[in-house]
Amino acid sequence: MSLFHLIAPSGYCIKQHAALRGIQRLTDAGHQVNNVEVIARRCERFAGTETERLEDLNSLARLTTPNTIVLAVRGGYGASRLLADIDWQALVARQQHDPLLICGHSDFTAIQCGLLAHGNVITFSGPMLVANFGADELNAFTEHHFWLALRNETFTIEWQGEGPTCRAEGTLWGGNLAMLISLIGTPWMPKIENGILVLEDINEHPFRVERMLLQLYHAGILPRQKAIILGSFSGSTPNDYDAGYNLESVYAFLRSRLSIPLITGLDFGHEQRTVTLPLGAHAILNNTREGTQLTISGHPVLKM
């Protein structure tokens, strides 16, 4: 089975019972889980001091255990504080041989983007310990797609997407929309041309989602891509003031401005049902009336 190494670079794990349930669920399945002490750390709202959380990341360059899945405990906030002090060069060098399979989402997007920007390091945007493996019930779709991505050098995700008939090919990248916005103009924002940009978020009103997408558009980032895929935007319910304005309104307005395809409907993000995407891998997107396919390759996988 597999070895999981936990890291907690972001928010304090307030749901300790869920973290313990996630560890138990993984061990019951025959996996080994290391570095479990990080789940109890706390300094203010963070999962430990800056020094402790930074060491979670920098120590990965010295991690010698082979075939290891590095799993973020949770998101929240905290990764942005660490970006200037992460030893990116050492992490990039480490990933060039026997790469760790690094997985997380939400606030962790900042670290994933930094690794991609500094050395084209591929990481996995997917489930985390508390929210997913530690849920009351582990979602079967999420579990299947996690192992699908980590065990197969080439795999395909299928869904019924909304958008124009299209075919696009390029580097798959993105993650949490708010975190990408926070990186614009910094050394940790990947400079990817002709890519396939995939985005998701949580607890953002539709007008805030639109404002962030327009910031990417006005910054020239969206027009430089081959395609955009939008995942879930949990907790984005409009109110009476919106008078019919909703996420579909956002998508329609963006499509009126973009000359590239925008495809929606992917189960990707903060919901219990989510795919796992290797950010930085090669992807081919096909969208037709019959459905949508995203074929991904070129990412590190577990050695079976």
Curated annotation (Swiss-Prot):
The catalytic residues are 106 (nucleophile), 200 (charge relay system), 270 (charge relay system)
Summarize what gene deletion causes.
Bacteriolysis during the stationary growth phase. Cells lacking this gene also accumulate UDP-MurNAc-tetrapeptide, an unusual compound that normally is not present at significant levels in E.coli cells.
The answer to whether the entry has keyword Phosphoprotein is: no
Q: Name one GO cellular component term.
A: cytosol
Kindly give the InterPro entries that the UniProt entry links to this protein: Carboxypeptidase_A_C_sf, Class_I_gatase-like, LdcA_N, Peptidase_S66_N, Peptidase_S66C, S66_fam
Q: Which domain of life is it from?
A: Bacteria
Q: Which GO terms describe its molecular function?
A: carboxypeptidase activity; muramoyltetrapeptide carboxypeptidase activity; peptidoglycan cross-bridge peptide endopeptidase activity; protein homodimerization activity; serine-type peptidase activity
Q: Which UniProt keywords apply?
A: Carboxypeptidase, Cell shape, Cell wall biogenesis/degradation, Cytoplasm, Hydrolase, Peptidoglycan synthesis, Protease, Serine protease
UniProt EC number: 3.4.17.13
Query: According to its UniProt record, where is this protein located?
Result: Cytoplasm
How is this protein's activity kept under control?
A: Inhibited by beta-lactams containing a D-amino acid side chain.
**Predominant localisation class:** cytoplasm
Catalysed reactions, as listed in the record? N-acetyl-D-glucosaminyl-N-acetylmuramoyl-L-alanyl-meso-2,6-diaminoheptanedioyl-D-alanine + H2O = N-acetyl-D-glucosaminyl-N-acetylmuramoyl-L-alanyl-meso-2,6-diaminoheptanedioate + D-alanine
Q: Does the keyword Cytoplasm apply?
A: yes
An individual GO BP term:
proteolysis
> By its UniProt entry, which Pfam families does this protein fall under?
Peptidase_S66, Peptidase_S66C
Its pathway is: Cell wall biogenesis; peptidoglycan recycling
Q: What does this protein do?
A: Releases the terminal D-alanine residue from the cytoplasmic tetrapeptide recycling product L-Ala-gamma-D-Glu-meso-Dap-D-Ala. To a lesser extent, can also cleave D-Ala from murein derivatives containing the tetrapeptide, i.e. MurNAc-tetrapeptide, UDP-MurNAc-tetrapeptide, GlcNAc-MurNAc-tetrapeptide, and GlcNAc-anhMurNAc-tetrapeptide. Does not act on murein sacculi or cross-linked muropeptides. The tripeptides produced by the LcdA reaction can then be reused as peptidoglycan building blocks; LcdA is thereby involved in murein recycling. Is also essential for viability during stationary phase.
Q: Which PANTHER family match?
A: MURAMOYLTETRAPEPTIDE CARBOXYPEPTIDASE (PTHR30237), MUREIN TETRAPEPTIDE CARBOXYPEPTIDASE (PTHR30237:SF2)
Similarity remark: Belongs to the peptidase S66 family.
Q: What is this protein called?
A: Murein tetrapeptide carboxypeptidase
